[in-house]
Design a protein with these regions (language model features):
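Active-site-adjacent segment of FAD-dependent monooxygenases/related oxidoreductases
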Residues: 45, 49-118, 222
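Glycine-rich FAD pyrophosphate-binding loop
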Residues: 25-45
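Conserved FAD-binding catalytic core of PHBH/FMO-like flavoproteins
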Residues: 114-118, 138-140, 164-273, 277
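FAD/FMN-dependent oxidoreductases across multiple families
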Residues: 242-305, 325, 347, 390-391, ...
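N-terminal Rossmann-fold NAD(P) dinucleotide-binding loop
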Residues: 17-18
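A conserved short coil-to-beta-strand element within the FAD-binding core of flavoproteins
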Residues: 127-141
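Core beta-strand elements of the Rossmann-like FAD/NAD(P) dinucleotide-binding domain
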Residues: 4-6, 153-164
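Helical substrate-recognition/capping region of FAD-dependent monooxygenase/halogenase enzymes
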Residues: 2-7, 11, 27, 83, ...
């Protein structure tokens, strides 16, 4: 077998590239991160961290390191030019185990992501390496980089070989240009100036989106006493004006007394972008993060969208590297992630349009907001963050719940016959393609732990209230062993001890999980399934009645291009695009 320098070359040491390398390392594979700079970027860019990203950081074993640099339950208020609150975004549920929104200090978080690579002997971060060449050689890639001194002098040129390469080097991505894919979308002409200050002169912990017709602004309370302001520049204001201290003081004077006394940490200008690459894959080369899509900042989803990319791609690369799946599995990365990234861009662009309305449009907006706030259903739509598009994978590594066929999964699900005599199902929607919940649970070894700590970071087959092996034939059990599928039985806490005794002699090990909070019972109670198969990224790959388990697993094998027990080479069964 040919030996390569590493398994995956990651181009760019931003949060996406570092997270991807950590996720590859935690699953036992090698990754080399090449970064053109000689150090991590030391100024904050992203300021919002959501529960999905935290779940990923927990999977990577990094959340405990990162948590001290965050503020949970970051409340966001949209206010008009007079300061009246038009809408409040303050979700308090924790479906995925963590508060829905956090503020964070990105440079400190990025340092922890970089330090996390030291845990793995097969991962490394190389600064001062600017990638200048890519070559797809069929069974591997060759990545060429110039090693330059901090003064810019060329020291050496190196070429690394790897099974795959992933470009995570931002919006001006060399990798994307090498791939030759279109970067579709638009870049609005509006420019913004960002100011970060120490010793927060306001001291409030939340976020204000100022939809002020005179000059839209953003004011954000961040950890460690940092305050961020963002101000829109008018078309007749040159960018160079931001270098004038008097101009900057005039922007800040409406928000804080004595702006000249502020301790400015960082100041810069930027332009919002809304773009997405036409494809996230070309052969053995992939795009992730800003290299794949540029996200307007309004909902704080740029950082989080990139982490979703890393979460999705990392387990698929790991499966192929371990010969658990064929290369065809990697085609589902672009299939699954591109649509959601595009949807998130659209929502962010709409939010920006609401912020930038003129006097007449702003007045109409304020009237509409007042009317919507009178209707609890519509008010909660904003308060509970229900307008945020949640990832739902309709094509890819999914099995349709109604037909148990691979590659596509319809959101709607109609119960039929007498097979699922449930009533008031959750909106008649299938859970397939959605992220599974993460309550705190009990086991024989620990109490009150997060579900992911029990199920782990690979495949899980779970049933409610029964022994999952009762529904599996010999071929299914062989599949479970081959792909290290964890078998789990969710039980009411009152039945956990009984189940542990009862299932002790089952043909495969079963982890019994006590549902101490009732969250798992509530989840199954309104869904027409008694069995779920969870992917390594905690999304539901299949859901069915317990007796349908063999059909669901057979379809999953095809949807994920998984290898079989007897195959010498990985199978290459196609997945619907």
């Amino acid at each position: 077998m040919t030996t390569f320098d590493t398994d995956v070359v990651v181009i760019g040491a931003g949060p996406v590239g570092l997270t991807l390398a950590n996720l590859i390392g935690v699953r036992g594979h090698r990754a080399t991160v090449l970064e053109a700079r000689h150090e991590l970027i030391d100024y904050p860019r992203g300021v919002g961290l959501d529960d999905e990203s935290i779940r990923t950081l927990h999977t990577a074993g990094l959340w405990e390191r990162v948590e001290p640099y965050t503020v949970p339950h970051h409340v966001v208020r949209l206010v008009n030019g007079t300061g009246r609150v038009l809408a409040t975004n303050n979700p308090r549920t924790q479906e995925f185990g963590y508060p829905r929104k956090h503020g964070f200090v990105q440079p400190l978080v990025d340092k922890e992501l970089a330090a996390g690579l030291d845990r793995f002997p097969g991962t490394e971060l190389r600064f001062g390496h600017k990638v200048t060449g890519l070559e797809d050689r069929g069974d591997h890639v060759a990545v060429t980089a110039e090693l330059r001194s901090p003064e810019g002098e060329l020291v050496d040129s190196v070429t690394l070989t790897a099974r795959y390469a992933v470009g995570c080097e931002g919006g001006s991505s060399f990798t994307r240009k090498w791939m030759g894919v279109d970067f579709e979308g638009k870049s609005p002409s509006t420019r913004w100036v960002v100011v970060d200050v120490a010793n927060d002169p306001i001291g409030t912990p939340s976020v204000y989106l100022g939809a002020d017709p005179r000059r839209p602004y953003v004011s954000i309370g961040l950890p460690q006493g940092i305050r961020r302001w963002e101000f829109m520049l008018h078309d007749d204001e040159p960018t160079e004006l931001c270098d004038d201290p008097a101009f900057m003081r005039s922007l800040l004077r409406r928000h804080v007394p004595d702006p000249a006394a502020l301790q400015v940490i960082n100041q810069r200008t930027f332009t919002h972008h809304g773009r997405v690459a036409a494809d996230f894959r070309k052969g053995r080369v992939f795009l992730a993060g800003d290299a794949a899509h540029l996200m307007p900042v309004w909902l704080g989803q740029g950082w989080n969208s990139g982490i979703r990319d890393a979460t999705n791609l990392a387990w698929k690369l790991s499966a192929v590297l371990a010969d658990d799946a064929s290369d065809a599995l990697l085609d589902t990365y672009s299939t699954e992630r591109r649509k959601h990234a595009s949807d998130m861009i659209d929502v962010n662009m709409a939010a920006g349009a609401v912020m930038k309305m003129g006097r007449f449009g702003g007045a109409m907006r304020d009237v509409a907001a007042s009317a919507l706030n009178l209707v609890p259903k519509w008010k909660s739509y904003f308060t509970e963050l229900r307008f945020k598009p949640m990832p739902r994978y309709a094509a890819g590594v999914v099995v349709d719940q109604a037909t148990l066929t691979p590659g596509r999964a319809r959101a709607g699900f109609k119960r039929g016959g007498g097979l699922a005599p449930f009533v008031d199902s959750a909106g008649e929607l299938s859970p397939v393609g959605l992220q599974f919940i993460q309550p705190r649970v009990n086991t024989s070894e620990a109490a009150g732990v997060l579900l992911d700590d029990v199920t782990g970071d690979w495949w899980t087959l779970a049933t409610w209230g029964t022994d999952p092996t009762a529904y599996l034939n010999a071929a299914d059990l062989a599949f479970v062993r081959r792909h290290r599928v964890k078998l789990v039985s969710f039980m009411p806490e009152t039945q956990r001890a009984w189940a542990e005794r009862q299932f002790a002699d089952s043909p495969a090990p079963i982890t019994v999980v006590g549902d101490g909070t009732g969250a798992l019972k509530d989840w199954f109670d309104v869904r027409a399934c008694g069995l779920v198969v969870l992917r390594p990224d905690h999304f539901v790959a299949a859901a069915c009645l317990t007796r349908q388990a063999p059909r669901a697993l057979a379809a999953l094998r095809r949807a994920a291009s998984l290898t079989t027990e007897s195959a010498d080479e990985p199978t290459r069964e196609g997945v619907a695009a």
